[in-house]
Amino acid sequence: MIRIGQGFDVHQLTEGRPLLLGGVHIPHPKGLLGHSDADVLLHTITDAALGAIGAGDLGKHFPDTDEAFKDADSKHLLSQAWQLVKNAGYTLGNVDCTVMAQKPKLAPYIEAMRKQIAELLETDVANVSVKATTTETLGFVGREEGIAAQAVILLQKAE
């Protein structure tokens, strides 16, 4: 049996915070605002994984109203969600992600993101795709007010 999950997330850019995407620190004057470390890419993957097994979303498992998750490391949140996937009897087929950001240019960091995500999902890097795009200066992403990401995940029943 296979299961598919989809995730989407947006975070506002703000000064005074580090920019983390896919578990990788990206040098930039602004970072993402959020209750946790606001890693928008890992959040979308977490949502996609939880959705694929019918277990809700990031907010259900790690609510931003709970101080226990204040400044939480999104790598830890994804690892906890991934344990639920494994407990449900599934393994990763593949995950395909897109990050939408006007700046910074993300191409130099894509491979590091793929490696980090592969490690968190206990898979080969060949099963992880991360792409980056701009919105051609349109909308909040184009005005550099925020960064958005989406992910689609394919899970397979473990043998």
Swiss-Prot record:
4-CDP-2-C-methyl-D-erythritol 2-phosphate binds at residues 9-11, 35-36, 57-59, 62-66, 133-136, 140, 143. Homotrimer. Binds 1 divalent metal cation per subunit. The keyword Protease does not apply. Its EC number is 4.6.1.12. It holds the Pfam family YgbB. The gene is ispF. One of its GO terms (molecular function) is metal ion binding. Keywords: Isoprene biosynthesis, Lyase, Metal-binding. It comes from Shouchella clausii (strain KSM-K16). It comes from the Bacteria. Involved in the biosynthesis of isopentenyl diphosphate (IPP) and dimethylallyl diphosphate (DMAPP), two major building blocks of isoprenoid compounds. Catalyzes the conversion of 4-diphosphocytidyl-2-C-methyl-D-erythritol 2-phosphate (CDP-ME2P) to 2-C-methyl-D-erythritol 2,4-cyclodiphosphate (ME-CPP) with a corresponding release of cytidine 5-monophosphate (CMP). Its cofactor is a divalent metal cation. It catalyses: 4-CDP-2-C-methyl-D-erythritol 2-phosphate = 2-C-methyl-D-erythritol 2,4-cyclic diphosphate + CMP. This is 2-C-methyl-D-erythritol 2,4-cyclodiphosphate synthase. Belongs to the IspF family. GO terms for biological process: isopentenyl diphosphate biosynthetic process, methylerythritol 4-phosphate pathway; terpenoid biosynthetic process. InterPro entries: MECDP_synthase (IPR003526), MECDP_synthase_CS (IPR020555), MECDP_synthase_sf (IPR036571). PANTHER family: 2-C-METHYL-D-ERYTHRITOL 2,4-CYCLODIPHOSPHATE SYNTHASE, CHLOROPLASTIC (PTHR43181:SF1). The record marks H35, T134 as: Transition state stabilizer. The lineage of its organism: Bacteria, Bacillati, Bacillota, Bacilli, Bacillales. Pathway: Isoprenoid biosynthesis; isopentenyl diphosphate biosynthesis via DXP pathway; isopentenyl diphosphate from 1-deoxy-D-xylulose 5-phosphate: step 4/6. A divalent metal cation binds at D9, H11, H43. The keyword ATP-binding does not apply.
